[in-house]
A protein has these predicted regions:
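Beta-strand-enriched cores of mature, soluble protein domains
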Residues: 26-175
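Bacterial N-terminal signal peptides
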Residues: 10-22
Length: 175
């Protein structure tokens, strides 16, 4: 009888220990959904010689985001776009999301954009990337980013289109 009780106690301790090791470190997958609005604040137009209508655009985009929870923050994209005028192109660079408490998430981002087939917008875009660094409550972050977006038609005097993006960050935090 004592052997059976000892076995049950040891078995219970095993499951409790396993539970702490697997779930007690706070490393569970999480998701953040952001609605982002941004505008080009800096751009340089570099026509590619011998390829008519094609330009390389080093650029900076600044904007704001809101989470599903209502939390607000700001963002900055620094990157390059390759554009075949009127046909679309590709982009790549880095994003920094800055939260109200000072926490940050840094991501890579690459994607494509194309003309809106309905002609209502300047274009549509889709991209993805990796979460590569975090600070504050996002220290130790790793994960992925997916993004879909709409490029608004430019208004006279604007240096580039405003965008509205829906972004999903799937991540884990290392202890």
């Amino acid at each position: 009888m004592a052997t059976k009780k000892t076995f049950l106690v040891l078995l219970g301790l095993f499951f409790i220990t396993a539970g702490f090791l697997l779930f007690g470190n706070g490393v569970g997958a999480e998701t953040l959904k952001l609605q982002v609005s941004n505008v080009i604040t800096k751009v340089e137009l570099l026509p590619l010689d011998n390829i008519e209508g094609t330009v390389l655009l080093p650029l900076v985009r600044d904007g704001t985001f809101v989470l599903e929870t209502g939390e607000l923050g700001s963002m900055k994209f620094i990157g390059t776009a390759y554009n075949m005028v009127g046909k679309g192109g590709s982009f790549s660079g880095y994003l920094v999301y800055i939260f109200g408490d000072g926490s940050t998430i840094v991501t890579s981002l690459a994607g494509t954009f194309w003309a809106d087939p309905e002609g209502k917008l300047a274009g549509l875009q889709k991209g993805s990337g990796e979460l590569i660094n975090g600070a504050g409550r996002f220290k130790g972050i790793k994960g992925t980013l997916t993004m879909t977006g709409k490029l608004l038609k430019t208004i006279k005097g604007e240096i580039g289109s405003k965008t509205y993006n829906e972004v999903i960050l799937d991540y884990t935090l290392s202890p």
